[in-house]
Amino acid sequence: MSNIASVEVELGGHRIEQEDIDELLAAGRNSLDPDGRMILHAQPTLYTLDGLQGVKRPLGLHADKLGVDIHVVCADQSPIRNIDLCVRSAHLGVESIIASPVATGLAVLSEEERELGVALVEIGGGVTNVSLFAGGMLVGLTSIPFGAADITDDIASAFGARRNQAERMKCFYGSATASPRDNHDMIEIAPMSSEDEGESHRITRAQLIAVIRQRLEHLVGEINAALKELGFTGPVGRQVVLTGGGAELKGMADYVQGVLGRAVRVGRPRGLIGLPDAHSGPGFATLAGLVYYAASDPIDVRVIKPHHQQVIRSDHQGLLEKLISAIKTAF
């Protein structure tokens, strides 16, 4: 669940100091109402000065009223607690729980894309997350309750195949786009059980792609509706980045681009030196993003440091140095 909480404080026209921003964010923290859910993130987006919206850095400016929109990401408590319990049962500690788009955006989106406006579509196994970035930050999020695993189930049901074989067919022979040659390429499907030896059958690649396309039409239609609901239209709505395991389907970017009428690319983890090729695909983007998140210093109104305790972050400090610093602090 994603929503925007707005808060405003009186300044009396004086120059905005860091203490004023801290006071505003503290007021925002006190105004949060999760409605029984667990807050994962409460990040300030853009500020307002006397009603003028879209100010990214108000420090040093003058205003009678200073406001901020806080993007709040919540989730039902029970699933989050179950995930936490599973990880701790494996004798691992949990530092924090991060919403997938927050981490994935760090791994696959460039700073310019996040500034100008971009939609990030994560096609996972059972859920597709659609998020919107603008002004350098996450400003909207919604989820669609199906994903790439539904394509696998459709293939298994349509051709009487086992799920593991259906997944293999999707990965090796599947495509989001069709060609005339697909009618001549044959795919052999093994029997459902070992007792049915000799009863394998064959289908054309065109038949497989037809089943995949039917599910994709539904999925991309839901993605398009979600983008419109988030306000992803006009000049800001020109760039879409696909990621997640479902984005690895052959021809996926071309198909989505044709349906949405927007520029579409597949997002892969970037900037991590030494990442194996097998782990550099879109299916590993969230894991890579968690590394970035752990090495960064994200702003959250629930954890506000007094001005004299704030650490000035340097853009010149590399990811490796940040990780080493974090390890030294922990041990």
Predicted ranges, named:
Residues 75, 174-178, 235-259:
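Glycine-rich phosphate-binding loops at beta-strand->alpha-helix junctions
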Residues 87, 122, 155, 223, ...:
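Residue-level signature of catalytic and energy-coupling elements of molecular machines
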Residues 1-120, 137-138, 148, 161-209, ...:
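Nucleotide/phosphate-binding catalytic cleft detector across ATP-hydrolyzing
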Residues 153, 206, 210, 214-221, ...:
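Feature representing long, continuous alpha-helical segments
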Residues 259-287:
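Conserved phosphate-binding/catalytic loops in two-lobed NTP-binding clefts
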Residues 220, 224-239:
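Phosphate/pyrophosphate-binding loops at sites that engage ATP/ADP/AMP, CoA/4′-phosphopantetheine
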Residues 120-127, 133-136, 145-149, 244-249:
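A short acidic Gly-Thr/Ser loop motif
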Residues 113-114, 228, 255-261:
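Short, solvent-exposed amphipathic alpha-helical segments in soluble enzyme
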